[in-house]
Amino acid sequence: MAFKLASSPHLKVQLQTQSVMRRVILCALPGIAAQCYFFGFGVLIQVMLAIVVALTAEAAVLALRKRAVLSTISDNSALLTAILIGVAIPPIAPWWLVVIGTLFAIVLVKQLYGGLGQNIFNPAMAAYVMLLISFPVQMTSWSIPTAIAQNPMDIGLTLQAIFGSMSAEQLSLYKLGFDGVAMATPLDTVKTDLSLGLTTSESLTKAIFSDGYGVGWFWVNMAYLAGGLIMLKLKVIRWHISFAILGSLFVCSSFGYLLSPDTHVGPLLQLFSGATMIAAFFIATDPVTAATSVKGRLLFGTLIGVMVYVIRTYGGYPDAFAFAVLLANLCAPFIDYYVKPRTYGHRTGN
């Protein structure tokens, strides 16, 4: 058998930043589509608004810094940040919320540190935490899934809700489910019920849990999981961080559930509710703000998974990925310093 031998250098071509970002965005599309299907047109409107603000803000800052505008914007990093912010914002949140968050992410968290590759925090998660602390009411008013909403919103009503032409009384009616209760996320519902003295099993009897995991949230997480697996197949990301997050979260939640099933959420609900899959595959794997070595990435992911469980279970926020990712970003330089790969040719001393 004849083998064709190419001339040197025998180097593997590395993906350019633009190509990597494009592939990540394409792999996120199934999850975005699932969110739009279950939570309405507001998801798409928030994403589009975030994209416009992100690209405009990045172009303005680059022009002020006298940097190349078109070549920098075309790397798609601002586009990806905008998409992550858009899907993290409640679908019918007021328009100014996503504008403030996107400006904060692009101008302060990314460009103020020098641009792509220089920021120490994940811009989308930093913006999310800033908004959550500054505007807790707006950031925790998540839409009822259209399948159990008393009054599902069409695109016209969604635009009215986002851009402020709908009264507060009208808006409250569109946030009610079939049981007459306005809810946030499944995890938030359980956390609120536990604080009222109900057990986990009693909380799971509500309409939002009619499919066992939280209507819509299971399929949204499955869609992001599918996109994440495609990224692994395309070698856009490595498996260490994602699997460390999911594995540590599963182990911690299983242990807590076995000890006290009445006051703890089961592992499957932890994995397929909230932002678990999008955070594990699309957010925590950001190569700029994560650890770099194999052991470092495993430790980085495990740290996020454990912190998510602790904050979800004992903290004041039901979905803790943004806080966990930012805290892990702080620890990434420390992890890289102390967890270094063995140098090629290294020999242990006798």
UniProtKB/Swiss-Prot annotation:
- Supply the EC number(s): 7.-.-.-
Per UniProt, the enzyme's principal EC class comes to: translocase
Residues that span the membrane, as ranges: 37-57, 68-88, 89-109, 120-140, 212-232, 239-259, 265-285, 291-311, 315-335
Q: A single GO CC term, please?
A: plasma membrane
**Needs which cofactor?**
FMN
Membrane topology annotation: Multi-pass membrane protein
Q: Which domain of life does the protein's organism represent? A: Bacteria
One of its GO biological process terms is: electron transport chain
Tell me the keywords, alphabetical order.
Cell inner membrane, Cell membrane, Electron transport, Flavoprotein, FMN, Membrane, Phosphoprotein, Translocase, Transmembrane, Transmembrane helix, Transport
Q: Where in the cell is it found?
A: Cell inner membrane
Q: Which InterPro entries match?
A: NqrB/RnfD, RnfD_bac
Task: List modified residues, type FMN phosphoryl threonine.
Answer: 185
Q: What is its main location?
A: membrane
* Subunit comment: The complex is composed of six subunits: RnfA, RnfB, RnfC, RnfD, RnfE and RnfG.
Q: Which HAMAP family match?
A: RsxD_RnfD
Q: What does this protein do?
A: Part of a membrane-bound complex that couples electron transfer with translocation of ions across the membrane.
Alphabetized PANTHER family for the sequence: ELECTRON TRANSPORT COMPLEX PROTEIN RNFD, ION-TRANSLOCATING OXIDOREDUCTASE COMPLEX SUBUNIT D
Q: Which family does it belong to?
A: Belongs to the NqrB/RnfD family.
Protein name, per record: Ion-translocating oxidoreductase complex subunit D
Q: Tell me which species this is from.
A: Shewanella pealeana (strain ATCC 700345 / ANG-SQ1)
